Amino acid sequence: MPRIVKLSDRIQYLQVSYEPLSADVVAVRGDSAWWIFDVGACDMAVDFINALPRNPVSENASQGALENRESAAPVSIPLQKNIVISHFHRDHLLNVVRHCDGEVSLDFDTLYVGLHASKVVGEMNCREKRTVTAPISFDDGIHIEVLPIPNSHAKGSLALIADDYVFLGDATYPMVGHGTPDVYNVQILEQQIKMLKSLSPTHFCLSHKRGLVRDKSSVIQFLESVYARRQKNENYIVA
């Protein structure tokens, strides 16, 4: 049975499950919102997301209240729930589709998706959907960034940065061959390595891996070892 793992005071995740295949679901608590990375495909993932508390954060109503805290009347502001979908494969986003179809009720406010995942999800009622084609950042008590990432595995993939952690989903994995060898695209892999090197976080988090978290250097070293096997006039590298 999947279990909930705490990475820091602000970050926890529900581990991957296999029947059905359901990716790790990450929850990052900002000062004003939960930032949820992927939604999985199983009922336990729905329960995990729905159980994230919207406990109000107290803020002072005015600058005058800031200067006189004893007389300040706090304003209760419930936490928002923002979902970031890494890519369009069903083990990462099925529960959003199930929500849209009325099969389950998923508690969230805004959905951030890449172009391909946006097409899979389709139109949404009573929820905001934002299609991400360029990096967007938020100061939410911690640094939050949602950014497209070049990869061989799935078009339109997104990563989520939360301070010193970057959640990559399946972006470092090859394109699945479905009966033929899995492969990396040479040009895209080169772009990905360059981008990953430019990122500040030192903790790289890969879906479906035991323990989830890897050192930045080890992930880049592995990808560079794959890239080193490229052959002249060949567009792909067998994984």
Model-derived regions, located:
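Conserved beta-strand hairpin/beta-sheet module of binuclear metal-dependent hydrolase folds
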Residues: P2-P53, L158-Y173
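C-terminal regulatory/interaction regions
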Residues: V238-A239
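Active-site HxH/HxHxD metal-binding segment of metal-dependent hydrolases
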Residues: D43-F138
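Residues that act as N-cap/strand-start positions at coil-to-secondary-structure junctions
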Residues: P20-S22, R130-V132, A154
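Metallo-beta-lactamase
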Residues: W34-I36, A41-D43, H143, L147-A228
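Residues at alpha-helix caps and immediate loop-helix transition turns in enzyme cores, especially N-
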Residues: D24, D47-F48, N95, D215-V219
